[in-house]
Amino acid sequence: MTHYHFVGIKGSGMSSLAQIMHDLGHEVQGSDIESYVFTEVALRNKGIKILPFDANNITKEMVVIQGNAFPDNHEEIVRAHELKLDIIKYHDFLGHVINQYTSVAVTGAHGKTSTTGLLSHVMNGDKKTSFLIGDGTGMGLPGSDYFAFEACEYRRHFLSYHPDYAIMTNIDFDHPDYFKNIDDVYDAFQHMALNVKKGIIAWGDDEYLRKLDVDIPVYYYGFKETDDIYAKNIQITEKGTQFDVYIKGEFYDQFLSPQYGNHNILNALAVIAISYLEDMNVENIKEALITFGGVKRRFNETKVSNQVIVDDYAHHPREISATIETARKKYPQKDVVAVFQPHTFSRTQAFLNEFAESLSKADQVFLCEIFGSIRENTGDLTIEDLINRIDGSTLIDENSIDVLEKFDNAVILFMGAGDIQKLLKAYFEKLGVKNDF
């Protein structure tokens, strides 16, 4: 048994990885900021100790896992060096862990977490699968043959991984504080593709994914008959979305997903492709797909009277559009109200017009102050720059949250990757609703 200390244990990936090592029988603790982060619930439920940052947390015979947001001059990392301990970066450690399994990486600019959550749930319907999801959820199942995990492209961290399979949901320009342009993003994915051992499952409509140059098979999925795996005869029902799946031009089977929106059908196709390639029982896969309940902060719903209140991680224009589309398809008779908190100044600056365009698809828009990151907490623009681009939009905070009560028959979308949950919590308190994130 190894004693692990995670520096930045509340980070979504770090939280997941800490839970996995705990499940596999190791002693695990970690440190982070003292303010509430939704990932800490799962850690506390497993009895994993969360400490405030302090050099004295680091003791002899520990292995220290260093979160990517924390520099080498962090007090705990400095102490670990003084004690000559093993210090391993998060992505390097995860790269080591996956080598023990048949591994499936899920990467892409958008849809990673939802697809990884679906993949782990569906695969566990047929084969024991450990998993790491970017919503702070992780599980290490002793005796697992498979490992499903989320692989982030930021700073090319995913190049530490050599998975058996990779699902690539899309390539898009994001993280403008690191990537120069879309070609730089493509270069990162091309290099990641070269690390994959058995096969790549990629969205067929993505022009950049179509250019991948590898020696292993690439299976494209989508809605076109030219794709290797595609969906036809899509029907939206009260139970969800039903569709037929064709593989290499031949009918495979009919599936029902409890989710709505084309992006969720695409996620399901990618997962079905993996199960097909690994010869999993299709009846088990169908049954598992029906019972998928979603992942944290991805269209998580709470119904209060005639309002549907949604907590969602959407923080890029395309993700916002997809979330609004889901609300429209699932609740066509309701208005859609967007409450959005931009995440990082660099992303807000880079996609200012795109944010305005995607948010304008809602019936009413409320905006919060821009949320900075640990690496970047100031910028040259303000939230007023976005407000001025969206007709009828207005600023909202915890003190003015009661304005949302006037939208009687509506879906209220709380979207963002920062601390938008503070507003959501304030609104629930205003409504007298108890909700544990």
UniProtKB/Swiss-Prot annotation:
GO terms for cellular component: cytoplasm. ATP binds at G108, A109, H110, G111, K112, T113, S114. InterPro entries: Mur-like_cat_sf (IPR036565), Mur_ligase_C (IPR004101), Mur_ligase_C_dom_sf (IPR036615), Mur_ligase_cen (IPR013221), Mur_ligase_N (IPR000713), MurCDEF_pg_biosynth (IPR050061), UDP-N-AcMur_Ala_ligase_MurC (IPR005758). The keyword Cytoplasm applies. The keyword ATP-binding applies. Pfam families: Mur_ligase, Mur_ligase_C, Mur_ligase_M. It is found in: Cytoplasm. Pathway: Cell wall biogenesis; peptidoglycan biosynthesis. It is an enzyme of class 6 (ligase). Keywords: ATP-binding, Cell cycle, Cell division, Cell shape, Cell wall biogenesis/degradation, Cytoplasm, Ligase, Nucleotide-binding, Peptidoglycan synthesis. Its EC number is 6.3.2.8. One of its GO terms (biological process) is cell division. It catalyses: UDP-N-acetyl-alpha-D-muramate + L-alanine + ATP = UDP-N-acetyl-alpha-D-muramoyl-L-alanine + ADP + phosphate + H(+). GO terms for molecular function: ATP binding; UDP-N-acetylmuramate-L-alanine ligase activity. Belongs to the MurCDEF family. Cell wall formation. This is UDP-N-acetylmuramate--L-alanine ligase. The lineage of its organism: Bacteria, Bacillati, Bacillota, Bacilli, Bacillales. The gene is murC.
